[in-house]
Amino acid sequence: MLVNVSLAVAVAASLLGSAAAAPLVAVKQLVERKVNASPDFNITFSSSHTDGLPRTLIMATGGTIAGSSASATDSTNYRAGSIGVAALVDAVPQLLNVSNIDGMQVSNVDSGSITDDIVLLISKLANKALCGSDPEYDAVVVTHGTETLEETAYTLDATLMCDKTVVVVGAMRPATAISADGPSNLLEAVTTAVSPASHGRGVLVVLNDRICQALYCAKTNANALDTFKAYEQGFVGGPLSTKPFFYYPPSQPTFKTVYDLSNVTSLPRVDVLYSHQMATFDGVNASVANGAKGFIGAGTGAGGISPWAKQNLAYVMSQGIPVVASTKINNGVVAPDEDPAAGSYISSALLNPVKSRRLLQSL
């Protein structure tokens, strides 16, 4: 069912043609590469400067961490993205003992409203902040809603062109809630981001006293504070008294691939198709007519889909549109078929459907 090729190599030419971003294999090569990012830093908040402290750029996008409610006991009916980056920093004065802070309000929405353009902008700004020939910052922290946090975190991990640290952080309770988790999460995120021990680990997700690698991290519970996990791979560490404590020396995930998006101005549309018994995927032709350039199948088990869905996917693949087989199961690998002639789906390997989508867009 699956061709014996990696997702990273198989679809680059078919998705973006000659404009495809070039894959970079060795992390050491990334440090030497120059980044030509075009967007400017529109700083909306700057802390007083303290000599000797590192400099951190906080890019705020909204989400529950910036949410508010009329009741301190209400952790469900609240307005996400109602508090600005300056208020987030002001609520945690201990941040200024750790780092000089510049804040940028990239957006202020719930994470379900985050667009491809916002994610691409964050990627370009992170590279400009950290990876240029004369970087302005020592670390980047992105505040984000938890619903799609893993998508943005993974995109940053797959597009950051140096070994400096980006941390993505959110909260499960709004800022107005009793025992709001946002302030402590933000302090731990900044402390982790500026720590030299965090270098060379890729993009990290920090929530609820846990540090998780972005490639493997996923939201696993709709409500609980301890929601972000990497079931099979485990956490890489956890903050102790807000300072990061890592369980292992710095390393990168085995299946990590990094792509240079510095010259990419927009991301192609890629849709995720959820499989089930008697799934047909009848809507794929309409999606193609409306601009879809690729599809991810959130398959049953190890990437399975129904015979009726296969018929529709076979048609769009005949038009040169790539289809990636992933799985809606939380863990496991969608392996390539041993017989390349068995079909033309692309294996997602360890990537879940939403991360497969982001990688396909980046190729």
Residue spans for each PLM region:
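Fungal secretory targeting signals
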Residues: M1-V27
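ATP/NTP phosphate-donor binding region
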Residues: V25-A129
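Internal gly/pro-rich beta-alpha loop/helix module
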Residues: V168-S241
